[in-house]
């Protein structure tokens, strides 16, 4: 077999076993890329990969800058922020001529019994505020959760003021929880320097007990039957809080996360009161655990938590008319809310001791309310005149939470400096985000070019290598002697190296080695099978000749066997095996016409006196197997 190095051609020479002259066959690969084009393509891939590496470094640097700027903005505004949302009047409610509640962009004024009280907030959402507007103010804190900070979003307020609507919403107007989950997946999909995974858990705190809302055992059972699941609050050496026994599911997309969220909502404890027909009688806590890992080798996984909490409604027993178990539920809710207020107030005042152990709610949120955490509380109030007492109680709670960090406590000059600093940071944030967006677009474009170039390179060069390996065995190799040695892997490697188009980083891939090994095994197996068939035929012919009882036949057979040996000794060619006649004409015609396996078929002898019966052949063949 000859290989043309100029055009990548394989020439098949004339077979030595064929009696007729065979015209040499030429196989030409039309898909071969010229060497200079292959080298140019390889160089282009290398340059593009270097550009991808540089773009990722720039993107990582800008992302770190964005994280720092965002953290400064949130800290300047306050790591614990309090918003207020005023519920609109319902269609069944009578709207008074003079409303008791008036509000501005960051304050609420309550008028009652000839007096007025003013409460300040970081932001006030009016009655006409939409779900999208509320989420717009919450969205930046979600980015902090992806950046590695623990984040806590709480909905607080009197029963019937719209806490559950703000957190859950409806199918037409989704609430904060579904919007936040969707935003997390959107942000994670655009992060080209980190891989992000999410796990989800839901539980409720009912009268001081923990209930797993995503457990497979949850159904329409009574709480006493379903509360047997053991959930224990534990704190590790680093201060991270874990709940032993709590179900945690990995969510791969928003659809699956929304399904689990709806499942947990359906088994939450609710009850009828004078104020609300479906009053929440517990605190519902949804936890999204975020695992963020860099693409660089040796990067560590950052773990952060996002808590979205729909707190039970604060209420006065005289207003709700609760008795029995409903009254006990209300008391338990009020006690845990009071403990939460104490913790937030202590954190805002930066006290040395924070009373986390006063309730299960604050124990669970210990690592999400303290240092490096971001807290956002949404206080809900009613505009009705009948609810003024409960409204004042809710706003007084938030006043404790905001503590001494009221903007009114600052002088006009300090207030202007604070606003100017926030404005400058927000401008820097926009510039950084715009830079990240441009780099991401360019990075995506370059990665597409790299993939296209690599695909072209593999299609052309790898196909040529496969053709060489396949054509290394000539289509007429089966006509050669059975002792011919197949082409070894060393020769194939030399063929590859001599072609000159294989790039340095593809000279020894796993795929090529596997194809090499499989090809060699097939060639060796084919040669071995041909040798075994030839050996069996030799033994078969010998056994037939020895079984003949006629001495004359033995002499004729001996002469017919020794003559080729003498001729072979004189000419230097190997002897031919003894041949016999077979009476089955159809089998004889089939064997004579079969040119693909000349060594495995049985041919006739020129001496008619040494013919054997077909039954003898069958009997001897069965004994060989």
Curated annotation (Swiss-Prot):
One of its GO terms (biological process) is microtubule-based movement. It holds the Pfam family Kinesin. Residues 577-587 have a biased composition (Basic and acidic residues). GO terms for molecular function: ATP binding; microtubule binding; microtubule motor activity. One of its GO terms (cellular component) is microtubule. ATP binds at residues 157-164. InterPro entries: Kinesin-like_fam, Kinesin_motor_dom, Kinesin_motor_dom_sf, P-loop_NTPase. Residues 561-625 are annotated as: Disordered. Gene3D superfamilies: Kinesin motor domain. Transmembrane segments: none annotated. Residues 79-404 form the Kinesin motor domain. Residues 35-73, 400-456 form a coiled coil. It comes from the Eukaryota. Belongs to the TRAFAC class myosin-kinesin ATPase superfamily. Kinesin family. KIN-14 subfamily. This is Kinesin-like protein KIN-14U.
């Amino acid at each position: 077999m000859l290989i043309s190095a100029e055009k990548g051609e394989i020439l098949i020479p004339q077979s030595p076993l064929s009696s007729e002259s065979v015209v040499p066959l030429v196989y030409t690969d039309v898909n071969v890329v010229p060497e200079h084009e292959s080298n140019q393509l390889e160089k282009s891939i290398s340059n593009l990969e270097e550009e991808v590496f540089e773009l990722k470094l720039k993107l990582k640097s800008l992302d770190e800058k964005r994280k720092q700027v965002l953290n400064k903005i949130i800290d300047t505004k306050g790591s614990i922020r309090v918003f207020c949302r005023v519920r609109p009047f319902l269609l069944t409610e009578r709207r008074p001529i003079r409303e008791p509640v008036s509000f501005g962009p960051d304050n609420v004024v309550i008028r009652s019994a000839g007096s007025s009280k003013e409460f300040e907030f970081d932001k006030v959402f009016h009655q006409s505020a939409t779900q999208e507007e509320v989420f717009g103010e919450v969205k930046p804190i979600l980015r902090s959760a992806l950046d590695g900070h623990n984040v806590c979003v709480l909905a607080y307020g009197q029963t019937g003021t719209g806490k559950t609507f703000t957190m859950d919403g409806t199918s037409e107007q989704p609430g904060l929880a579904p919007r936040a989950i969707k935003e997390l997946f959107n942000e994670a999909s655009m992060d080209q320097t980190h891989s992000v995974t999410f796990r989800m858990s839901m539980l409720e705190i009912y009268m001081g007990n923990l209930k797993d809302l995503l457990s497979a055992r949850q159904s329409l059972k009574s709480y006493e039957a379903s509360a047997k699941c053991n959930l224990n609050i534990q704190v590790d050496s680093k201060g991270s809080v874990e709940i032993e026994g709590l179900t945690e599911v990995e969510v791969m997309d928003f659809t699956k996360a929304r399904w689990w969220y709806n499942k947990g909502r359906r088994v939450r404890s609710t009850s009828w009161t004078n104020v609300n027909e479906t009053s929440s009688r517990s605190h519902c806590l949804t936890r999204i655990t975020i695992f963020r890992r860099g693409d660089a080798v040796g990067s560590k996984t950052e773990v952060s938590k996002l808590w979205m909490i729909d707190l039970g409604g604060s209420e006065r027993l005289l207003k709700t008319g609760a008795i029995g178990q409903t009254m006990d539920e209300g008391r338990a809710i009020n006690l845990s809310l009071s403990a939460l207020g104490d913790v937030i107030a202590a954190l805002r005042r930066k006290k040395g001791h924070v009373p986390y152990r006063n309730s299960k709610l604050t124990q669970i949120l210990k690592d999400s309310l303290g240092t490096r955490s971001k807290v956002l509380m949404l206080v809900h109030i009613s505009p009705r005149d009948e609810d003024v007492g409960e409204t004042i109680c809710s706003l007084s709670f938030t006043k404790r939470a905001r503590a001494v960090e009221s903007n009114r406590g600052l002088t006009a000059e300090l207030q202007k400096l604070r606003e100017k600093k926030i404005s400058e940071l927000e401008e820097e944030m926009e510039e950084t985000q715009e830079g990240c967006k441009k780099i991401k677009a360019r990075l995506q474009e370059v990665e597409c070019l790299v993939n296209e170039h690599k695909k072209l390179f593999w299609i052309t060069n790898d196909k040529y290598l496969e053709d060489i390996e396949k054509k290394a065995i000539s289509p007429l190799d089966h006509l050669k002697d059975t002792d011919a040695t197949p082409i070894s892997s060393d020769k194939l490697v030399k063929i590859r190296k001599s072609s000159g188009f294989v790039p340095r980083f593809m000279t020894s891939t796993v795929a090529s080695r596997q194809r090499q090994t499989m090809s060699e095994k097939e060639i060796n197996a084919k040669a071995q099978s041909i040798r075994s068939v030839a050996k069996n035929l030799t033994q078969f012919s010998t056994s037939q000749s020895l079984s003949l009882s006629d001495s004359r036949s033995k002499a004729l057979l001996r002469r017919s066997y020794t003559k080729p040996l003498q001729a072979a000794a004189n000419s230097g060619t190997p002897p031919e095996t003894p041949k016999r006649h077979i009476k089955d004409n159809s089998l004889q015609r089939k064997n004579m016409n079969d040119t693909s396996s000349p060594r495995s078929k049985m041919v006739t002898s020129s001496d008619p006196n040494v013919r054997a019966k077909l039954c003898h052949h069958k009997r001897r063949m069965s004994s060989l197997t």
